[in-house]
UniProtKB/Swiss-Prot annotation:
Residue spans of biased composition, Basic and acidic residues class: 1-38
Species in which this protein is naturally found: Mus musculus
Location in the cell: Endoplasmic reticulum membrane
Top EC group: transferase
Pathway linked to the protein: Phospholipid metabolism; CDP-diacylglycerol biosynthesis; CDP-diacylglycerol from sn-glycerol 3-phosphate: step 3/3
Ranges that cross the membrane: 78-98, 129-149, 165-185, 212-232, 261-281, 339-359
Name of the protein: Phosphatidate cytidylyltransferase 2
Stretch list, region Disordered: 1-48
Amino acid sequence: MTELRQRVVREDAPPEDKESESEAKLDGETASDSESRAETAPLPTSVDDTPEVLNRALSNLSSRWKNWWVRGILTLAMIAFFFIIIYLGPMVLMMIVMCVQIKCFHEIITIGYNVYHSYDLPWFRTLSWYFLLCVNYFFYGETVTDYFFTLVQREEPLRILSKYHRFISFALYLTGFCMFVLSLVKKHYRLQFYMFGWTHVTLLIVVTQSHLVIHNLFEGMIWFIVPISCVICNDIMAYMFGFFFGRTPLIKLSPKKTWEGFIGGFFATVVFGLLLSYVMSGYRCFVCPVEYNNDTNSFTVDCEPSDLFRLQEYNIPGVIQSAIGWKTVRMYPFQIHSIALSTFASLIGPFGGFFASGFKRAFKIKDFANTIPGHGGIMDRFDCQYLMATFVNVYIASFIRGPNPSKLIQQFLTLRPDQQLHIFNTLKSHLTDKGILTSALEDE
């Protein structure tokens, strides 16, 4: 009887009410049915894509030990590849970061597309990739202008693009925004806005933080290599400690994570960070920022190392002196900063992985993709790296970076002659009042 009354009420409703009710029903179905449809959608699931050679060699092992060896062998292969791209230099590293960014974006967007593909959303994938292009143009254009100012000012096309960079970026984004509005379909309004938000959050997580990775790299390769290596070390050591000694679950989002692995990974990462920092601080190619040399028409990483990368003597606290018998220790100041980096990599960095685990559980998938056997997708390997990159960038800006004289000089040389003369007279007057200029002339 209740159903009959509801049908009568619906039939007696005015046309406008019926239309709004049907819209609400469609929207409600979109919101409520998304989870149920996601269960049947062809999501990227984890499959056994282990190379046939490894499958044969490890066929007699249990699944636990087979996974151990597969992960171990491919981890060593990835580390070897990491060494190769480091050897090739910062510009190749920048290209690799961009490729990783594109692949991570593809993996996340593909999950959304596979979940909602049955709705046949117009222009979803096209607009997602278009917005990726727009955001990359904005961020990398800013980076090139900031770090390679001399090169940009020398080339006429680059100078024009640099001058109007933000306007061009805004125009590109506005075009995509208008395309999205024009693609709206009445029965999919709510879901289309869901996916619009999905794309923009993905851009925020992937592209913005990839941009920060590039910034860290240009400050000196050591600011790129040490943080990434600390995250890799923590991932490996936490897995090893958890594999052999793990008994106590750490977090429900990742049932395989244990307190033993978490704590063991922390101490191992701090020691590793100190040792790696000591080795790298002695090489100019690692500690010098990437700069464009106008004379040689090339990018260089040669400079006079700052105090951060010069050995200094530190007094050891009395309590520790009695234990080890040393009163002082010689180390690089950067090693002290490496403790902060390795601590973040091992204590806070894993929460990037936990966040990714929650995301995957929400969509009932094991991995983002099957790109790397035993490891999942590229995003599965970089979920902690992006959080680490943001921390390093903030750390450099807050505690390390100061005014850059070379950048100031480059900007000074682009001014008009009258502006240069005004700055010269102001600076001369300031130095004379301070007694610096007079003292310098007397010394000569």
